[in-house]
Amino acid sequence: MTNSNRIKLTWISFLSYALTGALVIVTGMVMGNIADYFHLPVSSMSNTFTFLNAGILISIFLNAWLMEIIPLKTQLRFGFILMVLAVAGLMFSHSLALFSAAMFVLGLVSGITMSIGTFLITQLYEGRQRGSRLLFTDSFFSMAGMIFPMVAAFLLARSIEWYWVYACIGLVYLAIFILTFGCEFPALGKHAQHSQAPVVKEKWGIGVLFLAVAALCYILGQLGFISWVPEYAKGLGMSLNDAGALVSDFWMSYMFGMWAFSFILRFFDLQRILTVLAGMAAVLMYLFITGTQAHMPWFILTLGFFSSAIYTSIITLGSQQTKVASPKLVNFILTCGTIGTMLTFVVTGPIVAHSGPQAALLTANGLYAVVFVMCFALGFVSRHRQHSSPAAH
């Protein structure tokens, strides 16, 4: 594989994460405007965004098999057509049913693209380099999560309709579409060149189960925590701006943490540093929940920084449980993480209604403790040390 081809594929991976990050994180910015557009209360409008999450979940789950049937380049190009149709549907339709369908299609497209992006990184890089590359790729999710809410705020402040925000997000996919030209993708399944040696199917092992549980608990814990921090802070008497600043601080330090750890991880055994980071994140979250208002910004900044490498390290370790990176295995762990996203309000909503926001934060803290236990237990069964090598292809 040529170096320019590898760079193109790597950029497709970066942009695939940016696309999903933009779609997921911009939701809160435009929800009120969309509710006004359809003359609905915001509470009932938020339910329609479940279609976006459902699309992401279904596509990541199915793409473990679709990758072996439909070439990756074909999937990405077809995804561009679907993206254009979905954005056009948002622009020209005043039907709530069509809006929900368009959101579902956007979810499908971003889920397929993100699973392809993850798989490309696991194919292009090996060993410790794979972990640092995946981490840098994941930082594009957070970067888009910082940039596109600002784009949305800029457009909405000038009374430009909300659907132009999604047109701007579509430009990310346009860049992916352009990059597919003159670019060779790894072939899978029936499209792959089969050698004379029979392919040995590898068993995943119990370590994959530990990592899948860790992925689900981590995402559910993280989103359950960050979704209710503003309400919790307001309950303590903080202003809306100060409560919002806590969330911004978290994502900002999360992004800087990803960049820092994409360099740091190369020098450590991945399972050991993951266990340390999971333990630190659980302790820092507990200190945030039980600490004074004066210390809350510092605790959430350090929590964002030290928890930034956890999810990507889980995926990287999963890909290293077999000698050859398996798209089904990587997608299985991604699916478990996405289930965590889907369950966020299903789990935390009733807890907040019954016991208040602090109970939701403590639940998230408990989930982080489960992540620590899973990562610690993984140390006894992980196969990554025998499968990882420091060199890239």
UniProtKB/Swiss-Prot annotation:
GO CC annotations, alphabetized: plasma membrane
Residues passing through the membrane, by range: 11-31, 51-71, 78-98, 101-121, 134-154, 162-182, 206-226, 245-265, 273-293, 298-318, 332-352, 361-381
Family recorded in the similarity comment: Belongs to the major facilitator superfamily. TsgA family.
UniProt membrane topology term: Multi-pass membrane protein
Pfam families, per the entry: MFS_1
Domain of life per record: Bacteria
Keywords: Cell inner membrane, Cell membrane, Membrane, Transmembrane, Transmembrane helix
Keyword Membrane listed: yes
PROSITE patterns from the UniProt entry: MFS (PS50850)
Protein name: Protein TsgA
The keyword Methyltransferase is assigned to this record: no
One of the record's GO molecular function terms: transmembrane transporter activity
Subcellular location: Cell inner membrane
Organism, as annotated: Salmonella paratyphi B (strain ATCC BAA-1250 / SPB7)
PANTHER family: L-FUCOSE-PROTON SYMPORTER, PROTEIN TSGA
NCBIfam families from the UniProt entry: PRK03699.1
